[in-house]
């Protein structure tokens, strides 16, 4: 008997396939029965070699980042550290992981967090129904060796891999991008487990051994700050607060993402949203809402903002009735006048 579970070392094999190999304490290796086809056979793109190239990389996918975000992303990629992005919903945190995946040519593996998330949903679980069918079939054929049956059913073909385990698998396109989205929705127990995974990028499966990534994934963790995430997890990462963009940057974002909107309307949309964020709202509109509003106004063939149009379309910008109620009466007109006044002053 082994004093500890054997270790599964994931190694690339020949012919573009991937082999799982089991290493015991004695150093013996036995090839596992199953193989896993890499999901992406394209050559990986080199990581950006500077902060400016990191910002340019994001810009390729029309993600207009400021230099501070470019700096922390560059350092995270260079140092192989997870990046922890915190900020209000709708400011573009999740999009960063998607952009990194597309521009670098890597797989995107997303773990959407929620209350009650456990190892079975985040890491792995066994296909119990398939295991029972296999046991019944083996017994029907006269197989009664308990040890052999246990070895067979706790093999990789019955293992259902969830995002965290998938992220440790090798890929010919390079290490994947692992997005752990809205970590603040989980509990402290899951945070503690995640901290252990991020420490060594390995996962122990008691029935099989320890799976360790040959090349750690690019990890992006996001939080909407609905609660404070434990300091221990944040210390493992490089941290960046993603705030609302300046008017100039938001204007550039809208022009890039919704190019069909006229220059005049785009400027009015951004100026109004910027003014709206200064109000005492339960949930201020994010960049996502700005883009949705610009697209909606374009669909309505609006050429310039007026109080009636703004009031009719507030549901695109604001998602809480209390916030919409705060803008009743002359408030919309006052904000619109303020926005237009700022535009005239900037001319």
What residue spans do the PLM features occupy?
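C-terminal regulatory/interaction module of P-loop NTP-utilizing enzymes
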Residues: 35-347
């Amino acid at each position: 008997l082994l004093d500890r579970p054997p270790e599964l070392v994931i190694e690339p094999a020949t012919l573009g396939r991937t082999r799982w190999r089991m290493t015991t304490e004695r150093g013996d290796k036995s090839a596992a029965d199953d193989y896993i086809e890499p999901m992406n056979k394209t050559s990986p793109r080199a990581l950006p070699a500077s902060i400016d190239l990191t910002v340019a990389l994001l810009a390729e996918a029309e993600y207009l980042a400021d230099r501070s975000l470019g700096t922390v992303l560059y350092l995270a990629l260079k140092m192989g550290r997870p990046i922890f992005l915190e900020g209000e919903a709708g400011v573009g945190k999740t999009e960063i992981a998607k952009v990194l995946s597309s521009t670098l040519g890597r797989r995107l593996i997303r773990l959407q967090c929620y209350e009650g998330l456990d190892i079975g949903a985040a890491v792995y679980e066994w296909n119990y129904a398939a295991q029972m069918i296999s046991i019944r079939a083996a017994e029907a054929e006269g197989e009664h060796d308990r040890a052999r049956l246990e070895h067979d059913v706790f093999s990789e073909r019955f293992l259902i891999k969830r995002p965290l385990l998938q992220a440790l698998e090798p890929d010919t396109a390079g290490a994947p991008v692992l997005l752990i989205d809205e970590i603040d929705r989980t509990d402290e127990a899951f945070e503690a487990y995640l901290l252990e995974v991020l420490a060594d990028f390995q996962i122990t499966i008691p029935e099989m051994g320890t799976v360790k990534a040959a090349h750690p994934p690019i990890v992006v963790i996001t939080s909407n700050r609905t609660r404070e995430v434990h300091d221990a997890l944040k210390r493992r990462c490089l941290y960046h607060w993603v705030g609302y963009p300046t008017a100039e940057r938001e204007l550039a974002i809208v022009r890039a993402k919704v190019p069909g909107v006229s220059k005049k309307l785009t400027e009015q949309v951004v100026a109004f949203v910027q003014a709206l964020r200064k109000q005492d709202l339960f949930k201020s509109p994010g960049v996502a809402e700005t883009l949705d509003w610009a697209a909606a106004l374009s669909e309505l063939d609006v050429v310039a903002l007026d109080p009636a149009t703004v009031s009719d379309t507030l549901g695109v910008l604001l998602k809480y009735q209390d916030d919409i109620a705060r803008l009743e009466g002359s408030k919309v007109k006052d904000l619109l006048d303020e926005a237009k006044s700022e535009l005239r002053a900037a001319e």
